[in-house]
Each structure stands twice: as structure tokens, then as C-alpha cells.
UniProtKB/Swiss-Prot annotation:
Keyword Ligase: no
Protein name: Diaminopimelate epimerase
Species assigned in the record: Bradyrhizobium diazoefficiens (strain JCM 10833 / BCRC 13528 / IAM 13628 / NBRC 14792 / USDA 110)
NCBIfam families for this protein: DapF
Reactions catalysed: (2S,6S)-2,6-diaminopimelate = meso-2,6-diaminopimelate
Length: 291
């Protein structure tokens, strides 16, 4: 039987990014990709974009090791909106105002934001090297790379900026983020051979130097109302191109995030809300073998 059968969970969202938080710090059992897919089942499951699993801390001074799953069962290195949901959950239960977590992408520090309903997560230092993103071939300058869809002489989307925020991101600069069928183009670009680990695909419009609008096709989850790491990647990419300041507001379909690419150490700070929806226990039938 799955470790998640009958296990408690919290359904939350980070500005529209659907999140399920499961605290398994008192267990040695492991969640499998099959478990993660079962949770999102249309037959009695809990719809989500990311599943955040808290496991026993492996390092002194950390609250937990966070395993992050997309709804297709694949693992993610980072999820900014999910981390804010975890932070709210921990802070409300313990009364803390600061915490450190370990993820596959490294250590993340978090703290209470400038207002009671805001939470800030230090998403770490972005990476720009083609091997770090990673890309399947060498690009010396990742501010733009040669990639397009559509006719060669009249491409529909082209020349994205690429960034790693612990997961790979490609940002296409457009005049109107709603003018493109992202549900059609997103999976084609996510699975393009240039991205050996697939990629998150974002359409971004720079409104002015401190405001950017985006839509994202999320790797392993699909079209989403919000992707925190995509907001971070977009802010960083725009600043690298000197088209935006290092402290910007990002508008997503689900809401707004404040992103600061801190100049003194290049860490990316993400500030936004985290909304609690309901609690429950997983139905064991979700994890029963088919047949």
C-alpha cells in the first residue's frame, strides 16, 4: 500500500498555482512517481500542479527536505509558489517567522514578508551556463539562443532567453502574452531536443522597467495560472538584457509576485501570498492497483 494512503494533506495555492502539501517528517516511507500521479487522478484525487512532500531534515538547522513532484509524476528541482505554501503551513503551526529548507536544488531560506499575508523565499542564485540549464548544445551567450517555431522567414516564437532557477526555463519576449496558443506551442517547446531535461516555457511582455506580464507552460504540469520559478527566471532574464530593473513586479494569470534579484549576492527573492483551501486524508482507493 502507498505511503500516502489515508495520509493527511493540505490543499493550497500560490496565486493560482495548485499545491498539495504533505508532511511526512515522522515517516521513513517514500513517495513514488506512481503515488504522485495517483494523487492527481480525475477519479477522486486532488487536482494539483505540484505536490510538496516534507521529509525528515537531513541537515542541522533545516526544517525539512522538500521533495517536489509535478502532476505527471516527474520530480521538480524548484517550485516557488509551492515553497510559499509550505512556509505558511510551517509558520502557522510553529509561530516561526524564518526557516531554512533543503531541496534538490539546494538550501532555501524563507521569512515572513512585509505584510501578514506575504511570504518571501530566497530562490538562490540563477545559473546561465549552457551546461547548467542544461542545453543539448553549446551556447556562449544564453541571454538569447537560436530556437524558433514556425516558418524560418516568419517564426511564430523565436530567440528565447534561458535561465536555470534549479529547473530549466525558456522565456520568449512578446508584445502580447495572450496572443499565442500556449497550450499548443508549450508542449512542443517543453520537449524540444535542445532541452535534454525538458523546460518550462514562458511568454513575457515587458510593460515597463519595473513591471512584466507572463504566462507559463510548466514542465510536467502544463498550462498554469502561476509559476514562481518562471517569474524569477523572467525577472533575471530581463535584467540581464538591461530591459528591466533588478526589482520588478510580475503579473501572472493568477496574481502578482514581487521579484528582487539582489545585487550584493545575486540571490533571487520572491514575495507573494499563499492561500489555504482545505485539509483532508487521501483515499486509499487512489493507490489500489488497477485491474
Amino acid at each position: 500500500m502507498s505511503a500516502l494512503a489515508n495520509h493527511a494533506f493540505a490543499k493550497m495555492n500560490g496565486i493560482g498555482n495548485e499545491i498539495v502539501v504533505v508532511d511526512m517528517r515522522d515517516s521513513t516511507a517514500k513517495v513514488t512517481p506512481d503515488d504522485a500521479r495517483a494523487v492527481a487522478s480525475a477519479q477522486g484525487g486532488v487536482p494539483y500542479d505540484q505536490l510538496m512532500v516534507l521529509q525528515k531534515p537531513r541537515l542541522d538547522g533545516t526544517e525539512a527536505f522538500i521533495s517536489i513532484y509535478n502532476n505527471d509524476g516527474s520530480e521538480a528541482g524548484a517550485c516557488g509558489n509551492g515553497m510559499r505554501c509550505v512556509v505558511r503551513r510551517i509558520f502557522e503551526k510553529t509561530g516561526q517567522a524564518t526557516a531554512t529548507f533543503e531541496t534538490a536544488a539546494g538550501l532555501l531560506n524563507a521569512w515572513q514578508g512585509p505584510a501578514p499575508d506575504l511570504y518571501t523565499v530566497d530562490m538562490g542564485v540563477p545559473k546561465f551556463g549552457w551546461q547548467d540549464i542544461p542545453l543539448a548544445e553549446e551556447f556562449r551567450d544564453t541571454r538569447y539562443i537560436e530556437l524558433q517555431i514556425g516558418p524560418i522567414d516568419n517564426p511564430i516564437l523565436h530567440s528565447p532567453s534561458v535561465v536555470s532557477m534549479g529547473n530549466p526555463h525558456a522565456i520568449f519576449w512578446v508584445d502580447d502574452v495572450n496572443a499565442y496558443d500556449l497550450a499548443r506551442f508549450g508542449p512542443l517547446l517543453e520537449n524540444h531536443p535542445i532541452f535534454p531535461e525538458r523546460a518550462n516555457i514562458t511568454l513575457a511582455h515587458i510593460v515597463d522597467r519595473d513591471h512584466i506580464t507572463i504566462r507559463t507552460w510548466e514542465r510536467g504540469a502544463g498550462l498554469t495560472r502561476a509559476c514562481g520559478s518562471a517569474a524569477c527566471a523572467t525577472a533575471v532574464a530581463a535584467a540581464r538584457l538591461k530591459r528591466a530593473e533588478r526589482n520588478v513586479e510580475i503579473t501572472l494569470p493568477g496574481g502578482k509576485l514581487g521579484i528582487e534579484w539582489r545585487e550584493r549576492d545575486d540571490h533571487v527573492l520572491m514575495t507573494g501570498t499563499a492561500t489555504f483551501e482545505y485539509e483532508g486524508n487521501f483515499d486509499p482507493a487512489l493507490f489500489a492497483p488497477a485491474g
